[in-house]
Regions:
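Hydrophobic transmembrane alpha-helices and their immediate loop junctions
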Residues: 1-187
Length: 187
């Protein structure tokens, strides 16, 4: 399941996905459908439609998050070459021959994505609050998309998670911040 498929290229960034990515998104359909039916009194059909829109928007906003990293990477002179979707989340791909970079460069690149999703979540929040008392596909979709962007891709991206095979932006920032401070202590 490590094979990647090319989806498209945006701003010279190649976007790929794995079969596991498709599976993990599809796995979200039953819980989102259940939540829509339970919390918003959606019918089964409405829950399925809302779930479809939610997972499509999750995928799109994950790409927007990564394109924020691509913009930051380009601005520091060491651009990204790809985005690899391996589950609900994705990884920034950099050239294999990239030279060792100073910690500040890694930190600037890691800071490129979260703020976009905070803004998306905040921009959708008034609509989410307004629509919360209105049942329907649009209401549930907007509420879920606002929450996903603000809490997961925005604030969640800043958590200092860094363990084998899974590092989020906050983990990268903490790792290179410690490295930067070690270098200062030596000097």
């Amino acid at each position: 399941m490590n094979k990647s498929f090319h989806l498209l290229t945006v701003f010279n960034v190649r976007i790929t996905f794995t079969p596991l990515c498709v599976v993990t998104y599809l796995i979200l359909i039953p819980p989102f459908t259940w939540l829509g039916m339970t919390l918003r009194n959606l019918t089964l059909a409405e829950g399925l439609i809302a779930s479809f829109f939610i997972i499509v928007l999750m995928f799109i906003t994950e790409n927007i998050h990564q394109l924020g990293h691509a913009w930051a990477a380009k601005s520091v002179g060491y651009p990204m070459i790809g985005i690899r979707h391996f589950s609900w989340f994705s990884a920034s791909i950099y050239p294999k021959d990239e030279p060792p970079l100073p910690p500040q460069t890694h930190i600037k690149r890691a800071l490129g994505g979260f703020w976009i999703n905070l803004l998306i979540g905040l921009a959708l929040a008034p609509f989410a609050f307004y629509l919360w008392n209105i049942n329907g596909v649009a209401a549930f979709t907007v509420v879920a998309t606002s929450a996903w962007n603000f809490f997961v891709l925005g604030l969640g991206a800043l958590l200092p998670i860094d363990f084998n095979g899974f590092t989020v932006d906050g983990g990268t920032i903490l790792h290179y911040w410690k490295e930067m401070n070690r270098d200062k202590m030596k000097g």
